From Swiss-Prot:
Chain's role: Participates in various redox reactions through the reversible oxidation of its active center dithiol to a disulfide and catalyzes dithiol-disulfide exchange reactions.
InterPro entries in alphabetical order: Thioredoxin, Thioredoxin-like_sf, Thioredoxin_CS, Thioredoxin_domain
UniProt keyword annotation of tRNA-binding present: no
The name this protein goes by in its record: Thioredoxin C-1
CDD domains documented for this protein: TRX_family (cd02947)
Gene3D superfamilies: Glutaredoxin
Family classification: Belongs to the thioredoxin family.
NCBIfam families reported in the protein's UniProt record: thioredoxin
Gene Ontology CC annotations of this record: cytoplasm
Organism: Corynebacterium nephridii
Amino acid sequence: ATVKVDNSNFQSDVLQSSEPVVVDFWAEWCGPCKMIAPALDEIATEMAGQVKIAKVNIDENPELAAQFGVRSIPTLLMFKDGELAANMVGAAPKSRLADWIKASA
């Protein structure tokens, strides 16, 4: 399953995570975000222990979106050891999402 992250737990759940974390920046009104949500849930389950998938609602956390320069959604950011390691903008099929996550993690 994916983890909901906001300003209060971004530091602990993402930046201080021992495993790589993919952060999905999304919003309720974003069709493509809703399209990839089930795929991200499946990938989170399939890759449990290897990678964590977190979700940030940009309407509730505009400062996090601004901090990482997120201008369009969905945007996926991969963090490793507290550093931004890779990013992917836009929706994609599950296979492509999984390949990107595996390659980046």
